[in-house]
Amino acid sequence: MMSKIFDLVVIGAGSGGLEAAWNAATLYKKRVAVIDVQMVHGPPFFSALGGTCVNVGCVPKKLMVTGAQYMEHLRESAGFGWEFDRTTLRAEWKKLIAVKDEAVLNINKSYEEMFRDTEGLEFFLGWGSLESKNVVNVRESADPASAVKERLETENILLASGSWPHMPNIPGIEHCISSNEAFYLPEPPRRVLTVGGGFISVEFAGIFNAYKPKDGQVTLCYRGEMILRGFDHTLREELTKQLTANGIQILTKENPAKVELNADGSKSVTFESGKKMDFDLVMMAIGRSPRTKDLQLQNAGVMIKNGGVQVDEYSRTNVSNIYAIGDVTNRVMLTPVAINEAAALVDTVFGTNPRKTDHTRVASAVFSIPPIGTCGLIEEVASKRYEVVAVYLSSFTPLMHNISGSKYKTFVAKIITNHSDGTVLGVHLLGDNAPEIIQGVGICLKLNAKISDFYNTIGVHPTSAEELCSMRTPSYYYVKGEKMEKPSEASL
């Protein structure tokens, strides 16, 4: 088979892989090949042009969460004078899925056009795997023994194959779905269990809760003590209260031991505690794993660390001409991070000024109902890195919810600082529009803003965000790792 020659071969057409390919082809006039298994979203492989984010991640999920929020908006509108016949209201799940599918397909098509219209950029449909450090095979399937469709020779290889939902090895796992399949359910489940305490489980619990039938019940189980491990503890506690107030059943310290299929098609879940419950749908959302299995990395000697491709701060692997970005590296599994890593890598490889991605102070969100916005360190981490940490905390009922009837919807804002110089180390928000607010806050943290910069800024009134400009007095401190309400002057 005759080989095709490229300057760069990218395995994976996700956000990071496409950014790298586009930049290399347009900014540096390189000949670039991109390999992926599917061009448009949906089964059997789910991920297609645009990767997880576009097809079975951020984009469709945000659309579905937006749809789910209308349930509460309609209920709350009565407090503002709106009257309507509630008996005629019904949620059309099929329409939600249809418009979601159309939106995702439009993005898929835009990437198809990019390949068609960009000189030097070529797409190959199939499974990419390494034959050597300079040769990538495009195969018919994931099976390393499957037929080779194309043989690509290249000076540089970029691994951008992303991640995949992790499914636990328990009896009956074949009766469960992952988040991939959840985007294509023909109808909303009546009794659903989302397994896991991370953002995917929490977000889908909110979606299912809004669209469930009237006699439906959403249950979330998590093996730990509180959902959203690694996030600010105050936000975790308050979100748990609000999810419960919205009717979601949260079971902590519970983990499925086995799943059995009942005669009526429902699933019987036996938990490790011995508890047994029946559900119509069980969705596993216990994390994602770097997608390295089918890459045949051993053929080029590429090393793995903690399940992901091992890279340095410039996204270089241990093999001089092979690089990796995004989820497959198991660093920060966020789309904007992968895009930034891609742009930096292409400049490093083909440009004259090597640069790297700063993985600190990355703003992110959980699109739960209500949502979370977060950037920087949580107090438990900050207190171990800095001698004295000051924590500013505020919680309140937003103006609209004094009228909407949802007074339980507390907005929480927390600012964490290095007390010695006032530098803001972290900001954590829970409540309406928190993800939108945190983006601007992220810029502040990148500029090393101090708490005085926050409270010397005039806020926009009336908004929840203005609370960030009003917090002048610490609520409590950490001194050498110990939490204190009012430490002595000497200790500060």
Swiss-Prot record:
Molecular function as annotated in GO: flavin adenine dinucleotide binding; glutathione-disulfide reductase (NADPH) activity; trypanothione-disulfide reductase (NADPH) activity
InterPro entries in the cross-refs: FAD/NAD-bd_sf (IPR036188), FAD/NAD-binding_dom (IPR023753), FAD/NAD-linked_Rdtase_dimer_sf (IPR016156), GSHR/TRXR-like (IPR046952), Pyr_nuc-diS_OxRdtase (IPR001100), Pyr_nucl-diS_OxRdtase_dimer (IPR004099), Pyr_OxRdtase_I_AS (IPR012999), Trypnth_redctse (IPR001864)
Domain of life: Eukaryota
Gene Ontology CC entries for this record: cytosol; mitochondrion
Residues at the active site: 461
Record's subcellular location: Cytoplasm
Reactions the enzyme catalyzes: trypanothione + NADP(+) = trypanothione disulfide + NADPH + H(+)
EC number(s) stated in the UniProt entry for this protein: 1.8.1.12
Residues bound to FAD: 36-52
Coiled-coil parts of chain: none
Further details from the record: The active site is a redox-active disulfide bond.
General function of this protein: Trypanothione is the parasite analog of glutathione; this enzyme is the equivalent of glutathione reductase.
Protein name, as recorded: Trypanothione reductase
Taxonomic source organism: Trypanosoma cruzi
Upper taxonomic lineage: Eukaryota, Discoba, Euglenozoa, Kinetoplastea, Metakinetoplastina
